[in-house]
């Protein structure tokens, strides 16, 4: 974790941009692909770093900030369901101090001094879902999706044992929300079946549950041992209860499965006692839990507290610490990524941690190996927090033998044997051989065909590797001539191992379908280092059309100062991204490839869809005591209308809203000639804007 106090504004801006892209990628892998790329603890560290940066530099908060998003964008695999009320995530807490801060925030917001009852319940590690009933009949089930739009999994939910299709004495309209999960022993049995049928094993129970419920073939879902718990109500025609405790009792009476392990805490001590109880006994439970959820028990108080961008103020998740294990390090392999970055991966003597067999772990970077003095044949400590690839946290020196081998940091690329470049004090090592490096070329093609890029279904990593190995493709362009090439081959693709007439016919259809693509997705598909989906959208918005984009990039490759300045001035494109864009287009082969792709693709112009108002992007500051609403509520309203709220007045401030006793901020705003309005003017102003929105 970086020291926020020592970071400059320029560095903060770069870091926020990098975090937005990285967290978006991790969200997509976790929520959509059901395939986490990093540990829960590593993700939480990145997310918390993003929050701290935003709190320190509120005027730098990005429009695509992870703190404003829930889950990830949904795919086109299922029909879409718009949630009548957003399905929000919970903020995370990692120690008792975080929980004390949470309880203090409740008191301050509600302006109360006494402890108000908190409902405590286990945090199930599964897939969140919503179920809607009309006149007692189950009509719609949906995943969380991005929090606003989910995937329609109605038929799949109906296969879950004991899930009620019809309920008696229900209100005319009822929504319930819960978690779909697979018990630990069922998970072990399922993986044995997968192995016996020569199918891929699931990494953990959460992945198994998510992958099972999101099956297009409902017959597969029906065979899976899925279970569920309901933990809250969503939108309903009439109030079922006035507290969380009453609600769960009512839902149980309506025949829903609710978790019986819960506690209504009347003190801070009772909260922490319940947490310790569950932390100690979690391994005795038949299902995975990764923490405890605390909620204000009183619904009226919940409604008063409301929400921030992605989570409720009245609830929080107290996460458990990571599970620790120990095993032998057998070897270290080096992987080469799409952008040429090398990543060391530990190959381990398989070890079961928390019900999951672990055989690989991340070593983060080469400097980390040296710092921890990790050697081949060492016994290493592992940390796992519900993740696919755990982390190596240290070495058991007491078990070190004389035959351990120090790892030599590579000098040449393991894929193409070209000399490597060391970046950032040896933390990052890159191969600069680009498309001439087989590993980079493979990863680049995989990225090009991925769902958020060209979205060519039927071309997964395995299929891409096969086509490259058979010399049927060598770059992204070859994909669009594959059908023609196949027709002239002596042995056709449909007659090769792993393929058939139907899969090949579907592939041709999917390739043809992919040839119509938006400019922002095309730019993202190119795989430019540090240019994720949001930054690709920024570039598309700036250049609008493919023809203009490639013309401007060609000028950039010839050191055109106007194009350089245009990119340099583009809000959201940091210095590091600018260098990466320049490096990418300096390579003539890249421009040639893009031009050839442009000739075979129908690349649509960028179209702006976001609604804006006069406050969008403006920086506001509040000062003094507000009489009508609390400062927190005022900030929330401003942010909903697109403004950014800062804690101090600067030359970047657009508007100061003054309550009682404005103080030094008012004085400074007058000195800087910043527009100033009082609370009444502000309330009248936002009332007009909210009507427009």
UniProtKB/Swiss-Prot annotation:
Annotated residues for binding of NAD(+): 40-44, 89-90, 121, 144, 179, 295, 319
Record-linked InterPro entries: BRCT_dom (IPR001357), BRCT_dom_sf (IPR036420), DisA/LigA_HHH (IPR041663), DNA_ligase (IPR001679), DNA_ligase_AS (IPR018239), DNAligase_adenylation (IPR013839), DNAligase_N (IPR013840), NA-bd_OB-fold (IPR012340)
Cofactors (names): Mg(2+); Mn(2+)
Pfam family, one: DNA_ligase_ZBD
Catalytic residues in the record: 123 (n6-amp-lysine intermediate)
DNA damage as UniProt keyword: yes
Gene Ontology BP annotations: DNA repair; DNA replication
Binding, Zn(2+): 413, 416, 431, 437
Known catalytic reactions: NAD(+) + (deoxyribonucleotide)n-3'-hydroxyl + 5'-phospho-(deoxyribonucleotide)m = (deoxyribonucleotide)n+m + AMP + beta-nicotinamide D-nucleotide
Residues annotated as domain BRCT: 610-693
Keywords: DNA damage, DNA repair, DNA replication, Ligase, Magnesium, Manganese, Metal-binding, NAD, Zinc
Keyword Transmembrane helix: no
Family of the protein in this entry: Belongs to the NAD-dependent DNA ligase family. LigA subfamily.
Role according to the record: DNA ligase that catalyzes the formation of phosphodiester linkages between 5'-phosphoryl and 3'-hydroxyl groups in double-stranded DNA using NAD as a coenzyme and as the energy source for the reaction. It is essential for DNA replication and repair of damaged DNA.
Name recorded for this polypeptide: DNA ligase
Organism this protein belongs to: Rickettsia typhi (strain ATCC VR-144 / Wilmington)
């Amino acid at each position: 974790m970086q020291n926020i106090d020592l970071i400059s504004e320029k560095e903060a801006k770069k870091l926020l941009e990098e975090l937005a892209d990285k967290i978006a990628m991790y969200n997509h892998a976790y929520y959509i692909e059901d395939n986490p790329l990093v540990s829960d603890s590593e993700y939480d560290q990145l997310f918390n770093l993003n929050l701290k940066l935003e709190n320190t530099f509120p005027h730098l908060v990005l429009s695509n900030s992870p703190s404003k998003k829930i889950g990830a964008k949904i795919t086109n695999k299922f029909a879409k369901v718009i949630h009548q009320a957003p399905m929000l995530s919970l903020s995370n807490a990692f120690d008792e101090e975080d929980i004390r801060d949470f309880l203090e925030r409740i008191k301050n917001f509600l302006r109360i001094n006494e402890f108000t009852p908190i409902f405590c319940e286990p945090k199930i590690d599964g897939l969140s879902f919503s179920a809607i009933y009309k006149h007692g009949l189950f009509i719609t089930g949906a995943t969380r999706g991005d929090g606003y739009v989910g995937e329609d999994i109605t038929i799949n939910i109906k296969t879950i044992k004991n899930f009620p299709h019809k309920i008696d004495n229900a209100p005319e309209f009822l929504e319930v929300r819960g978690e779909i999960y697979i018990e630990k022993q069922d998970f072990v049995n399922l993986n044995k079946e997968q192995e016996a049928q020569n199918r891929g094993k699931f990494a953990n129970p959460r992945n198994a549950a998510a992958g099972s419920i999101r099956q297009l073939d409902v017959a597969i879902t029906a065979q899976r041992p899925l279970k569920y718990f309901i933990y809250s109500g969503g939108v309903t025609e009439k109030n079922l209860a006035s507290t969380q405790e009453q609600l769960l009792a009512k839902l149980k009476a309506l025949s829903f499965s609710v978790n019986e392990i819960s506690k209504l805490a009347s003190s801070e001590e009772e909260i922490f006692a319940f947490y310790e109880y569950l932390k100690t006994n979690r391994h005795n439970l038949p299902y995975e839990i990764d923490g405890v959820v605390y909620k204000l028990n009183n619904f009226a108080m919940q409604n008063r507290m409301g929400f921030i961008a992605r989570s409720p103020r009245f609830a929080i998740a107290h996460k458990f610490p990571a599970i620790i294990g120990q095993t032998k390090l057998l070897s270290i392999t080096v992987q080469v990524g799409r952008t040429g970055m090398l990543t060391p991966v530990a190959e381990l003597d398989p070890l079961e941690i928390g019900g999951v067999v672990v055989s690989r772990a991340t070593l983060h970077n080469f400097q980390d190996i040296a710092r921890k003095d990790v050697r081949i044949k060492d016994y290493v400590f592992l940390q796992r927090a519900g993740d696919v690839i755990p982390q190596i946290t240290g070495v058991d020196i007491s078990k070190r033998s004389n035959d351990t081998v120090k790892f030599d940091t590579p000098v040449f690329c393991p894929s193409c044997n070209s000399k490597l470049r060391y970046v950032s004090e040896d933390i990052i090592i890159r191969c600069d051989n680009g498309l001439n490096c087989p590993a980079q070329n493979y990863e680049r093609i995989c990225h090009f065909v991925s769902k958020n890029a060209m979205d060519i279904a039927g071309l997964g990593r395995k299929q891409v590797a096969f086509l490259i190995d058979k010399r049927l493709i060598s770059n992204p362009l070859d994909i669009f001539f594959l059908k023609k090439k196949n027709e002239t081959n002596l042995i056709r693709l449909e007659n090769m191992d792993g393929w058939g007439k139907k899969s090949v016919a579907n592939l041709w259809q999917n390739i043809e379908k992919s040839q119509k693509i938006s400019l922002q997705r095309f730019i993202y598909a190119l795989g430019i280092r540090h240019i994720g989906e949001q930054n690709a959208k920024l570039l598309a918005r700036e250049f609008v059309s493919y023809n203009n984009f490639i013309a401007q990039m060609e000028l950039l490759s010839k050191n055109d100062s106007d194009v350089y300045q245009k990119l340099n001035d583009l809000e959201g494109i940091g210095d590091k991204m600018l260098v990466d864009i320049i490096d990418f287009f300096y390579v003539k082969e890249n421009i040639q490839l893009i031009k050839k792709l442009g000739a075979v693709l129908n690349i649509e112009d960028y179209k702006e869809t976001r609604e804006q108002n006069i406050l969008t992007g403006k920086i506001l500051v509040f000062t003094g005591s507000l009489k009508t609403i609390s400062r927190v509520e005022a900030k929330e309203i401003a942010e909903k209308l697109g403004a950014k709220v800062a804690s101090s007045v600067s030359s970047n401030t657009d508007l100061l809203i003054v309550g009682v006793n404005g103080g030094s901020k008012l004085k400074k705003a007058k000195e800087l000639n910043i527009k100033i309005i009082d609370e009444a003017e502000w309330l009248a102003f936002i009332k007009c804007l909210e009507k427009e929105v």
